[in-house]
């Protein structure tokens, strides 16, 4: 299985990206293609692994317009990585760089699965019982009801195909569980979800993201991105608070010793580096977007996520699921 990795994208590129790619090769045996500046790769790569390199002299900067950058920088590392998937030289692409540029490159080079108007970024987050798929987390800040319907279908298929959930429960993120609560968007979407080909349990609130009540939570990218980053911020704040309390005096330090192992496990469960990256669902190929602050561990796990999507034929499964909806006339006029 060949995974193309954009080594120039991310806050800690290229060193941490290369380290993560090499770790994935050593641990799981992936065939990784390093895409980026050849001199930078030669400086940090382990020559003993002899990983193939694809030259990409250009880099999309974080302050650049995604569409403009992709058009003006055809030799950028993210564009080249996605092109390897299009050309069949790689089975998937991974990037921790500019999310918008990765999204644009994927749309321009790979195209959308037929019937998908808006691809969505899906993040796997921990809950009390296992994992929850949250989508969209930022690819689409404004969505029509039909877009959210497709998000629900794709998220359900991802949970079933990749995470192994037999019958994923899908919830619509709103401000109350009652069908009458929400904004114009959620009120319009609710009846569509009731007729959708997945197990819709109704509206869910923010607290249900981590409760395990549902396996998939659907929202637009504006709400999803805020929800995800709020969760990350809460975890960081709690971790700092615990450290501060423990450090106050020697009694606190001694009393905390029995709980260190437990706290370490809790931290691991909520550590974004454990989950790697977010697959871009709805494009005609496997593309995984990793966190901009990804270290080697996060990159390694993003490659694992990409490999799981390829192994389970996620793209084909989504195409089939969306095709069934189209044939049954469940699509909406507003997209």
Swiss-Prot record:
Record-level GO cellular component terms: cytoplasm
InterPro entries (UniProt xref): FA_synthesis (IPR003664), Phospholipid_synth_PlsX-like (IPR012281)
Enzyme class: transferase
Pathway: Lipid metabolism; phospholipid metabolism
Listed EC numbers: 2.3.1.274
Disulfide bonding pattern of the chain: none
GO MF term list: phosphate:acyl-[acyl carrier protein] acyltransferase activity
One record GO biological process: fatty acid biosynthetic process
Recorded superkingdom: Bacteria
Chief location: cytoplasm
Record-linked Gene3D superfamilies: Isopropylmalate Dehydrogenase
Catalytic activity: a fatty acyl-[ACP] + phosphate = an acyl phosphate + holo-[ACP]
Keywords, comma-separated and alphabetical: Cytoplasm, Lipid biosynthesis, Lipid metabolism, Phospholipid biosynthesis, Phospholipid metabolism, Transferase
Pfam families recorded: FA_synthesis (PF02504)
Subcellular location: Cytoplasm
Family, as annotated: Belongs to the PlsX family.
Alphabetized PANTHER family for the sequence: FATTY ACID/PHOSPHOLIPID SYNTHESIS PROTEIN PLSX, PHOSPHATE ACYLTRANSFERASE
Family matches, as NCBIfam families: plsX
Subunit note: Homodimer. Probably interacts with PlsY.
Function noted in UniProt: Catalyzes the reversible formation of acyl-phosphate (acyl-PO(4)) from acyl-[acyl-carrier-protein] (acyl-ACP). This enzyme utilizes acyl-ACP as fatty acyl donor, but not acyl-CoA.
Name of the protein this chain belongs to: Phosphate acyltransferase
Organism: Desulforudis audaxviator (strain MP104C)
This protein's encoding gene: plsX
